[in-house]
Amino acid sequence: MAEYLSPGVYVEEFDSGAQPLEGASTSTAGFIGLAQRGATQGLPELITSIADFKRVFGSYLSENAFGSYRFLAYAVDQFFTNGGSRCYVMRVAPSDAVPASNTSAEASVLSLTAKNPGAWGNQIRAAIVPASKAKTQIFELLGDPAESKRYRVKSSAGFNVGDVVAFEDANGKQYNRIVSSQDNLIELESALEGGLEVVDNQLLPTKVLTTCEFTLHIFYGDEAEVFEKLSLNVAAANHIGKSMDRSGLLSALDLSTASAEAVPPFTVISGLPEEAGKYDIVFGNGSDGSIANLSAGDFIGEDNGPGRRTGIQSFIDNDVVSIMAIPGVTDPNVQLSLVAHCENLGSRFAILDIPREKTKVADVMTHRNIFDSSYCAMYNPWLQVFDPLDKRNIFIPPSGTVAGIYSRSDNTRGVQKAPANEVLRGVSGLEVQYNNGEQDILNPAGVNLIRHFTGQGTRVWGARTCSSNGLWKYINVRRLFIFVEQSIKNGTNWVVFEPNHEPLWARVQRTIDAFLTRVWRDGALAGTSPQEAFYINIGRQTMTQDDIDNGRLICVIGIAPVKPAEFVIFRITQKTGSE
């Protein structure tokens, strides 16, 4: 309790009403697949447009090189075409994919490697030029002019221990290395030639002492990076190994060793004097690897800890994604792992593709029967789209397109609307035209067909999960519960460690009541009143004294989700004129 020791008036603020509770995002997708470039471990990359995807992961992949694993770029393109606004992408690469590296003579001194594996790195070009981060003049030579290595300079700022420096006068350049630098006093490894002649007190000096660095220019397509005034001095803040961490194209490893003589880093790397002015670096040996070396494990990924996860596991720490897909990868082991990932987290929903070759109803059912989960849905057939790479029509898996429709429906109608009876944008045809009789078999089993209707375009014509439990057979019901659960979870962190008694219970009830009332008014819950749409129980009827003693606050919530009008039936009879 507050202390009141001095007489006076005290004004205090306190929270008593319902806490605002924001709805969780449901329209952000997560994709996994092969790409030209991009990180293969760590956190998935946020992508907000297809141009953004191309900048980070490269363009479309060729069928000859990547076969049926090439569909990530097409899926992301279709996601944005069909209304998606943002997604996270994680790249997968074959185990024998190799990053490009510099192949010039300097590689034994400075190893430059593409940030991630792939033949894309062979197109990188780089060049180094001499540079300097600091320049000064010598005001005074301290000690014996013939032997002294200590000098008072105008400013020692930028002159670090271990830096190679150049003293230049009318007689040319001489290189040295700094032993100590403090308070405008610099000590070198050896005395400069010339004795007192190195001193220059003029306003416009002709004798200068400069540090020796180099600037690295990197080019890839229309991308360019410049890292200025780099050093091979390991102790310096501008050491190339530290500075290159900011690069999106290359990583660097300094293999140089300190020489007996002071040699400028440009010369150490290139073998050329600084007067050469520029040294070009060539890259090669990068490889995309062979898709024959891909396995289910590459897509499932490994949990090697934060920042080192791969494949599906890389999405563990992402709390934004709510829709997941691995476009075109129909290996049951991969798909089952994706579904298990969604079930374990309880906050996302998987969209599954059916193998392209499985077009007959019996074959489709064989694949469908592998799964039984309300956290996934399956779509067929594959879609015909225009390929910007080969300038022809190709067939792609539907998962990316459907993910875009999920996002579009969520943003325009709400998560309570079944993502069906929606037109597919950018789709010119279907690989298979299913009829009503075939859908009569597939729809009850939970296979959502995409069909073309004359005059109405190509539409998603199903909204069922892969669950055998009738309570969870509709996609929008499962996703509505995900929305409600995540919203309440994210919005009630303030409750933790609060005193667990009646005032807190009443406040929690008011908070959730206000949120669910808003959800009901948005049309997501059935009923003509909030009392019919949901209930909230919290208090002694939901908690025993043992629960309270063990720090548990238990709130029981029931909601009535709206169900889609899947079968619209009009019963028509004759009416005579006399009736």
Residue ranges and their predicted role:
Residues M1-G118, A166-D169, F219-E223, V282, ...:
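Structured, hydrophobic secondary-structure cores that serve as assembly/anchoring elements
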Residues P99-T113, A119-G195:
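Autoprocessing Asn-cyclization modules and mimics
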Residues A100-S104, G121-I128, R177-V179, E223-P265, ...:
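Short amphipathic beta-strand/extended segments with alternating polar/hydrophobic composition
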Residues E106-S108, A157-V161, T206-T215, L553:
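A short, compositionally biased
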Residues A134-T136, A236-S243, G577-E579:
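Short, cationic low-complexity segments
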Residues G162-V164, I291-A296, L345:
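Bergerat-fold GHKL/Histidine-kinase-like ATPase
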Residues D169-G248:
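Small/polar beta-strand repeat architecture
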Residues S259-R308:
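Long, low-complexity, polar/charged, intrinsically disordered or flexibly structured peripheral segments
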